[in-house]
A protein has these predicted regions:
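Active-site cofactor/cluster-binding pocket
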Residues: 1-189
Length: 189
């Protein structure tokens, strides 16, 4: 099997690290070699968080090079735009249709770009989901990242039941049920 590359990007506190642990868990249970790497900017202050997940028969390096990501999972539209250059030409971008204004926009120093999803759709296959709205329907906005995991799971070759088992092992015990519901919501989108 050729090495597969996944990037997860978001803003501090959005659950990118949990998402990478779930992905790493499912891949490892399937018997592949997996490497995870995290880059924290000013994450605690709403800055970018990037995680890399690489897997295959044998993986030596945890970092995904520009233009090599098979899948880019973005928890926010601007983060999708910021890291889209990591995607392969035939890569898939899974993006949460959410806007979080960075400090430069809040202070008025810059404007938030318009038509991000349309621009990205010109270059890549884009799967857009309003995971926050779906999470609010479930009564817990914090599980929007698990909804995105469900969306991403459809493009990977691992059984749904195995995903649910890994989620159960990974999330805090008191959140298992809501996270399973969130995953199934994303999986059905």
């Amino acid at each position: 099997m050729k090495t597969k590359n996944i990037m997860i990007v978001g803003v501090g506190g959005q659950g990118t690290l949990l998402t990478s642990r779930v992905l790493g868990g499912i891949i490892q249970e399937a018997g592949y070699d997996v490497k995870l790497s995290e880059v924290h900017g000013m994450a605690q202050r709403g800055g970018s968080v990037v995680t890399f997940v690489r897997y295959g028969e044998k993986v030596y390096e945890p970092i995904v090079e520009e233009g090599q990501a098979d899948v880019l999972i973005a928890f926010e539209k601007l983060e999708a735009m910021r890291y889209a250059h990591f995607l392969k030409k035939d890569g898939v971008l899974i993006v949460n249709d959410q806007r979080m204004d960075p400090m430069t926009v809040v202070t008025g120093a810059m404007k938030y770009p318009e038509n991000i999803l349309e621009t990205l759709s010109e270059r890549f296959k884009v799967v857009s989901v309003d995971a926050m709205a779906e999470a609010k329907k479930l009564g817990n906005a914090r599980v929007f990242n698990t909804i995105i995991i469900g969306v991403a799971a459809k493009s990977m070759d691992f059984p749904k039941e195995q995903w649910l088992e890994v989620i159960e092992k990974t999330v805090p015990p008191k959140t298992i049920d809501i996270n399973k519901k969130a995953f199934l919501t994303g999986y059905s989108i």
